[in-house]
């Protein structure tokens, strides 16, 4: 694996010179191997190590290099034709392979090659970009988008129209992460490398980026870039220091543990927020 990483790192330093016409065999094979490993879930752009999320930047570099070495090509679809550098994940799947990998794909869901979809996942008409990782038992609902390199945990529900931000550039930026057992309400957006920690519930229409204030009404604490585990979050506003105006924020209205979530439905958690 170290040799593969070295090839990617070296090629990335001269990426501006690389084109589909002049890409050498070693670089091309290394990039294709990484994309295949991401596609199968053997590698992932970010993973939790000793309780902390670690981003493997060299894998993002490989994804970026794939755009340098590949030319646009016609992609056949059921309703249309497309023209892009990245093939679709399921282009060569037959029924046996779908059965073996154990997930459902409802037309016209689109998944790019290099994204991993785990068993027991359901993809409604949605979009999953290259480098993303979608773990077991997750529902990606209608018109939801999982951006490039985003990491989605086990038993997550991404409701209709949810946007999970992608990140390829700037290179140092971390991917957006939704940990296990989270619920993201319809039309909400989580972007810019924000981490929604395990067991959190995000209400409909909540927008969270790195600069969004995440206000815990119980403690008065303000978080940035991280929704603490077990939070129930709704959209709100906080007043300015001079009291002349208010600005948007996300509000943690309560905390719940796994036992409570198991006994109480998501809708009930969001209804009883006073």
Swiss-Prot record:
Localization in the cell: Cytoplasm
Keyword Repeat applies: yes
Top EC class of this enzyme: transferase
CDD domains in the cross-refs: LbH_THP_succinylT
An example Gene Ontology CC term for this record: cytoplasm
Transmembrane segments: none
UniProt: substrate binding residues: 104, 141
Signal peptide limits: none
GO BP annotations listed: diaminopimelate biosynthetic process; lysine biosynthetic process via diaminopimelate
Pathway noted in the entry: Amino-acid biosynthesis; L-lysine biosynthesis via DAP pathway; LL-2,6-diaminopimelate from (S)-tetrahydrodipicolinate (succinylase route): step 1/3
Enzyme Commission numbers on file: 2.3.1.117
Principal location class: cytoplasm
Reactions catalysed: (S)-2,3,4,5-tetrahydrodipicolinate + succinyl-CoA + H2O = (S)-2-succinylamino-6-oxoheptanedioate + CoA
UniProt cross-references to InterPro entries, sorted A to Z: DapD_Trfase_Hexpep_rpt_fam, Hexapep, Hexapep_transf_CS, THP_succinylTrfase_dom1, THP_succinylTrfase_N_sf, Trimer_LpxA-like_sf
Pfam families reported for this sequence: Hexapep_2 (PF14602), THDPS_N_2 (PF14805)
Keyword entries, A-Z: Acyltransferase, Amino-acid biosynthesis, Cytoplasm, Diaminopimelate biosynthesis, Lysine biosynthesis, Repeat, Transferase
GO molecular function terms noted in the UniProt entry: 2,3,4,5-tetrahydropyridine-2,6-dicarboxylate N-succinyltransferase activity; nucleotidyltransferase activity
Family: Belongs to the transferase hexapeptide repeat family.
HAMAP family on file: DapD
Record's subunit section: Homotrimer.
Protein name: 2,3,4,5-tetrahydropyridine-2,6-dicarboxylate N-succinyltransferase
């Amino acid at each position: 694996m170290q040799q593969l990483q070295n090839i990617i790192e070296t090629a990335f330093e001269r990426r501006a010179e690389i084109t589909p016409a002049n890409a050498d065999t070693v670089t091309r094979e290394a990039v294709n191997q990484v994309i295949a490993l991401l596609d199968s879930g053997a590698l992932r752009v970010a993973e939790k190590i000793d309780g902390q999320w670690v981003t493997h930047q060299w894998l993002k570099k490989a994804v970026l290099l794939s755009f340098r070495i590949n030319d646009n090509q016609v992609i056949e679809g059921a309703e249309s034709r497309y023209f892009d550098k990245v093939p679709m994940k399921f282009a060569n799947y037959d029924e046996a392979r779908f059965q073996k990998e154990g997930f459902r794909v409802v037309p016209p869901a689109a998944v790019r090659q290099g994204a991993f979809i785990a068993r027991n996942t359901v993809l409604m008409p949605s979009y999953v970009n290259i480098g993303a990782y979608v773990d077991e038992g997750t529902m990606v609902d209608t018109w939801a988008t999982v951006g490039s390199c985003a990491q989605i945990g086990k038993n997550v529900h991404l409701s209709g129209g949810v946007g999970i931000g992608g990140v390829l550039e700037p290179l140092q930026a971390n991917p957006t992460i939704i940990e296990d057992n989270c619920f993201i309400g319809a039309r909400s957006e989580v972007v810019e490398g924000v981490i929604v920690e395990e067991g959190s519930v995000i209400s409909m229409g909540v927008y969270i980026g790195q600069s969004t204030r995440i206000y815990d009404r119980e403690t008065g604490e303000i978080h940035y870039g991280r929704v603490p585990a077990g939070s129930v979050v709704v959209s709100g506003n906080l007043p300015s220091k001079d009291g002349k105006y208010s600005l948007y924020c996300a509000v943690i209205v309560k905390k719940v543990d796994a036992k409570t979530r198991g006994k109480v439905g998501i809708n009930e958690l969001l209804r009883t927020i006073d």
